[in-house]
């Protein structure tokens, strides 16, 4: 949201560019931080096709731009690339246990494909890529109705309700 960065507007070293990464963009950059995908299940399931296109077609466009400009790319990925893991905790070399056709697959598989594209661009074209797999983000502007575990816990606690833990409580 624009109000989250309002304090940066007008700074000489900051420029806000509103652009859908599914469409190529032509500009000069030296770093790209890709966080362009909804992470809340209701948000990414609302338009599943748009979600997977953002992760895949968007990543092709980002990597093409990075290759042309020799820019570094940081991808905000997700713990969802592990799916419903059989190993706890997961290490980076764990490939995951993912349902490729389930209702969440637009997000999970989109992020997995984006990581694949990044590594292929790195190996084939020397693009400098970094991937961070983020688990359970939270912060002062998070929506309490976004359907993720931290927001659900906070909402239940504020209402004085017990916290709902699904499964055995060993999930990471």
Q: Could you tell me what each predicted segment is?
A:
Residues 164:
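Nucleotide-binding/hydrolysis machinery
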Residues 140-147, 169-172:
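Substrate-binding strand-loop-helix patch
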Residues 152-158:
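Activation segment of eukaryotic-like protein kinases
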Residues 1-137, 157, 167-168:
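N-terminal Rossmann-like NAD(P)+-binding domain of SDR-like oxidoreductases, especially those catalyzing
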Residues 88-89, 144-152:
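A glycine/serine/threonine-rich, flexible loop-to-helix segment
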């Amino acid at each position: 949201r624009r109000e989250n960065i309002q304090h940066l507007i007008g700074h000489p070293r900051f420029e806000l560019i509103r652009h859908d990464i599914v469409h190529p963009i032509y500009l000069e950059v030296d770093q790209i931080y890709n966080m362009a995908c909804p992470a809340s299940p209701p948000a990414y399931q609302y338009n599943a096709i748009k979600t997977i296109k953002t992760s895949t077609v968007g990543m092709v466009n980002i990597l093409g731009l990075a290759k042309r400009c020799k820019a570094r790319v940081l991808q905000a990925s997700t713990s969802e690339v592990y799916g419903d893991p059989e190993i706890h905790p997961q290490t980076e070399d764990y490939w995951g246990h993912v349902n490729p056709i389930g209702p969440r697959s637009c997000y999970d598989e989109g992020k997995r494909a984006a990581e694949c594209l990044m590594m292929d661009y790195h190996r084939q074209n020397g693009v400098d890529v970094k991937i961070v797999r983020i688990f359970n983000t939270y912060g002062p502007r998070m929506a309490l109705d976004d359907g993720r575990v931290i927001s659900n816990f906070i909402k239940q606690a504020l209402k004085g309700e017990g916290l709902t833990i699904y499964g055995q409580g060993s999930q990471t």
